[in-house]
Amino acid sequence: MAVKTHHYETQNTNNNNNIYNIQVLNNYDKTDYSHLTERDYLRCINDVTQCAKTLICKVHFDPKKPENHNIYIPCIKNNLIMVYRNKTWEVEDRQKMIDDLYDDNQLALEEWYAQYSEKYPEFIKLFNQYINNISDNDAVLKDVKKMIVRMLYNKKQIVIKTRNQSLLKYGEEISGNVLPELSNETFLQL
């Protein structure tokens, strides 16, 4: 009697489905604040001295709002910043942009606060403390702006990842890090 041996071949198939739901980047001047909730603003105000920095982080580095990933600092050693405008990345003066970024977000906090201060009276003291600290002490404001600079540098990979995914979605050929990751030598030439 002969024994029949069956050889079975296993075939593994891997499917990778990458879904990118990336919107077109907003121009820096058209940054969208509409996704922010009352809770987001309250968390910012609760950070007292750092509330503008906290708002900037929520607006420009929120993974749920990649279209606002439109500003970052590529190199901490110089005075330049990258800003997305008119479908391109532009090199700008860092100090001027930090001042504008701070002022824009400070204004957004003040407008929100004016609208909701009666609803959240317990935050009146915190917000007034913030305004007084910033108004009365230039050193506090300088420290907050230094923290904003560090945040824009430390979170640059979020912006780079968004840009890379956006380029993949539109079929553009990319290799490695497509955002201008400029070296110190490049910045010295600018």
Regions found by a protein language model. Give the residues of each.
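Extended amphipathic coiled-coil helices
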Residues: M1-L190
